[in-house]
């Protein structure tokens, strides 16, 4: 499932993030690249222990915890702390696949990367190029969203970032381990949850809606790992 989630961050939160990132000390993006992706990666990134990265990461995680669409689609179990990158001056990231396992720095915690996420922090008209290109079942999907919007997609997907030829592209990127590691099962659960919420908004709870809700939770009970 490739899903675009609007307004994860408010305009005020985006502006706060951008102002802090403009004064940040950027490093070579290969500090977190795996062996394969390091050959394709050419961007700037905040070090994982950067106070700015930690502060902004907490803002992102708080916003996600309050976002019903994200929670329904991702069913998060463990979230890798958000990272932040910058593309400018022709920098890009060639086709690659994300590492299957990430260890949270300074801890023994390991996160299986079921879902990849990119949260855009620059408006589309602030830079040229910089599209996130994701290879999925239906071919290549080119994604370039408004600041504050986020895309999530299976971490098994090949993906790339096209060269930024003008301006600066700021974003947060991170991964999560879902309670349901199958993308197909997550998609079914998400579609069912969205349909139930839509029905509930149109009519009061009926026996049928209650029954469908029970089916959803029983499927989640069968498939979830906690």
From Swiss-Prot:
Enzyme class: oxidoreductase
SMART domains hit by this protein: P4Hc (SM00702)
Keywords linked to the UniProt accession: Dioxygenase, Iron, Metal-binding, Oxidoreductase, Vitamin C
Superkingdom: Bacteria
GO biological process: DNA damage response; intracellular iron ion homeostasis
Residues the record lists as binding Fe cation: 96, 98, 159
InterPro entries: Oxoglu/Fe-dep_dioxygenase_dom, PKHD_C, PKHD_hydroxylase, Pro_4_hyd_alph, Pro_4_hyd_alph_FE2OG_OXY
HAMAP family listed in its UniProt record: Hydroxyl_YbiX
Protein name, per record: PKHD-type hydroxylase Sde_2812
Native source species: Saccharophagus degradans (strain 2-40 / ATCC 43961 / DSM 17024)
Lineage: Bacteria, Pseudomonadati, Pseudomonadota, Gammaproteobacteria, Cellvibrionales
